[in-house]
Each structure stands twice: as structure tokens, then as C-alpha cells.
Regions:
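C-terminal catalytic domain of photolyase/cryptochrome flavoproteins
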Residues: 3-237
């Protein structure tokens, strides 16, 4: 672990001959003195119990496509391939694509953490575990993060070009042709309503869910059920 007081002066010294935007410099420094130290603090404060946190009782096995990249979801496929090639992925790919799917699908936190530890060259447990357990999976129930970072396909479409070349249609909310992130997002909120509906940062999402009629709720749950059946039967999803 490189301590902050050594890291930052060295970084600032390298900037003297480089033309780097101020917002990029600020963002990097804030990550070093803020988020990194916060993760380290959570780890030392909450271990070893933190390693077994599973607030949402997520129990779905880690899909094989996390290792093989054999999936029809282009965002997942691309991020896994990048990880295979480089032992690295951007933090948004980790959180809002791979972590987001793990959250929505209810993957077991221990298996997700094991995967992150194995595949990334920069994965040290003190920083990987809080980010995955607390930030990506909300498995600690809000110790680290104030809400689950759950998002539908529309978010991924806005933030990337993955959806343009995907097998699924991101504009379709249901059926086997629709993006799984769309119905899995609402199914996630339905499944975990008892634990999450009082979270103020999810109030708009739950108000939208309440406006949906029973038929819509049933369709969401049906699509999610079919998806999980195919996944658990070894079919390509």
C-alpha cells in the first residue's frame, strides 16, 4: 500500500510538464485521498464479518459466461473479453455493467468477490471487497453505499455503444427479444421490495413500479423467470 503523502507529491511533480485538464487532476486526487482511504477504512473496521455479508439473500450461482464471455449480452461479453485480455476494466464497466448484472440477477456475493479477485491485476482484497460487497452488490445493507447501484438497459445505452451491436433490443422492456437488464431491473425491485422500498434514493423507482398494473408486474416476473430458467439450464442468454 503506497501511502497518500508519498503518492500525491510524486503525482503533482509529474504534472509540471504535462497539459492535463484541471478536472482530470482533481478527480484523480479526490479518488486517492477520498475513496481509496474510505475503502481501506471500511475493510479494517468491518472485517472479518464483512466478507460474509449478504443483505439481499442473493443466492444465484455465478454464470459461466463470467469466465467464457459466451453470452448474447454484448455489454457483458465485451467487458469480460476486455478483462480476459488485459486483466483490467474501467471502474464503470466493473460497477455498472458486470456489478450491475450481478446485483440484478442476485448472484452470490462470495462468488462475485472471488471472480473479481481472480481476474483483475489490481484486485487487492482491502479495496476489492468493499467495492464489490458494498458498492456493486449492496450486500452490506448500506454500510458503505446509501443505495443499490441498479440500472436498466437504458443507462447502459446512454453511457456506451454496447447496445448498438447487441443480440437484444434495448428499447424492448419485455419478451425474450428485450434487453435482460430491463426486466431484471424491475424484477430486482419487486423481489427486494420489503428491504428496499423505504430507501429514499429509490423512492422514484418504487413510485413508478406502483403505477404499473398487476399484468405488467406479472409480465416482468415471467420474463425474469424464463431468463433464470435458461441460465440455470446452461442455455446461452
Amino acid at each position: 500500500l503506497i501511502i497518500t503523502l508519498i503518492c500525491l507529491p510524486t503525482f503533482l511533480e509529474t504534472l509540471k510538464e504535462k497539459d492535463i485538464p484541471l478536472n482530470s487532476i482533481e478527480g484523480f486526487i479526490r479518488q486517492i485521498i477520498g475513496w481509496r482511504e474510505f475503502m481501506r477504512g471500511i475493510y479494517w473496521l468491518k472485517m472479518p464479518e464483512y466478507e460474509q455479508q449478504n443483505f439481499l439473500n442473493a443466492n444465484q450461482k455465478l454464470p459461466s459466461f463470467f469466465w467464457t464471455s459466451e453470452t448474447n449480452m454484448n455489454c457483458i461479453k465485451t467487458c469480460v473479453k476486455n478483462t480476459q485480455d488485459n486483466a483490467y476494466a474501467h471502474h464503470i464497466q466493473r460497477l455498472m455493467v458486470l456489478g450491475n448484472f450481478a446485483l440484478l440477477a442476485g448472484l452470490r456475493p462470495t462468488e462475485v468477490n472471488d471472480w473479481f479477485m481472480v481476474v483483475y491485476a489490481d484486485a487487492y482484497q482491502w479495496v476489492e471487497l468493499p467495492n464489490v460487497t458494498g458498492m456493486a452488490l449492496f450486500a452490506d445493507g448500506g454500510i458503505l453505499s446509501s443505495k443499490p447501484y441498479a440500472a436498466s438497459g437504458s443507462y447502459i445505452n446512454k453511457m456506451s455503444d454496447y447496445c448498438k451491436n447487441c443480440y437484444y433490443n434495448v428499447n424492448k422492456k419485455n419478451t425474450v427479444e428485450g434487453c435482460p437488464f430491463n426486466y431484471l431491473y424491475w424484477d430486482f425491485l419487486i423481489r427486494n421490495k420489503e428491504k428496499l422500498h423505504k430507501n429514499q434514493r429509490l423512492s422514484l423507482a418504487y413510485k413508478t413500479l406502483e403505477r404499473m398494473d398487476l399484468a405488467k408486474h406479472n409480465l416482468i416476473k415471467k420474463d425474469a423467470k424464463v431468463f433464470f430458467q435458461r441460465l440455470n439450464n446452461g442455455q446461452k442468454v
